[in-house]
Amino acid sequence: DVIEIMVQRLYARCGLTDETDFQMLGSKDYPTLSELYGLIEAEYKGFDSGERQLYTAELLQNILLGLHSMCRGPEAKFFNGHTNITDSSFVTFGVKGVLQASRNLRDALLFNTLSFMSNRLLTVGNTVAGLDEFYLFLSNLTAVEYVRNFMKRVRKKDSAVIIASQNLEDFNLDGVKEYTKPLFSIPTHQFLFNAGSIDARFYTDTLQLEESEYNLIRYTQRGVCLYKCGNERYNLMVNAPEHKAKLFGKAGGR
């Protein structure tokens, strides 16, 4: 609550109120975390214990200690400053560099990214979000819940979500499968290819396939897949046009 009060004061100093038309503002019209830290620090240094206050000096001190790293310390490079996204028509978030970071830092950055995606998918609309190597985020149940909510609601805003992962078993881990199982029943369009060495029963149960449907992709065939759309099923052969095949190259993805 104290942080909320301080943020309101900071916004008021910058001329931002409930009456402000935020659609007319750019990223640099907003204050940064270092400015928030400076405001709280000034409040702490000038604290008058002789007057009645909504908070104590000790509480302000604890807030400063908790925020220091992300406002002025080593984590400030991730959180303090204005966004460098000038055109959001095509944005790639490379998260490889933070996968080895502490869990708290990684989760905070992931929450920022998912919040941005949520706004584009569900508020702006007509947006496609692709999540590659999704197994890396399955340990964060908040992220899984975010994505599940995306997938349930994006169609209403003409948006779409694409999820890619290495192995289906990653979604079946204890403590996770209760959240991930709905992800396979939500998509309107599904392209299902041969599952490789995955157990057939597990594959059919997870993706809710009939035995006859599974038999169409039981054996490895390049480009052959089962396409599901509502109650319709098609056995497809997927071929890349020549002009797109050139974009893929011949180095096996390297």
Task: Give residue spans per PLM region.
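P-loop NTPase motor domains
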Residues: 1-159, 163, 216, 220, ...
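Short secondary-structure boundary/capping segments
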Residues: 12, 17-24, 145, 177-180, ...
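Short, glycine-/Ser/Thr-/acidic-enriched flexible segments
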Residues: 96-99, 135, 168-169, 197-198, ...
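Short, surface-exposed polybasic-aromatic patches that bind anionic ligands, especially phosphate groups
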Residues: 239-240, 249
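Acidic, low-complexity intrinsically disordered tails
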Residues: 250-254
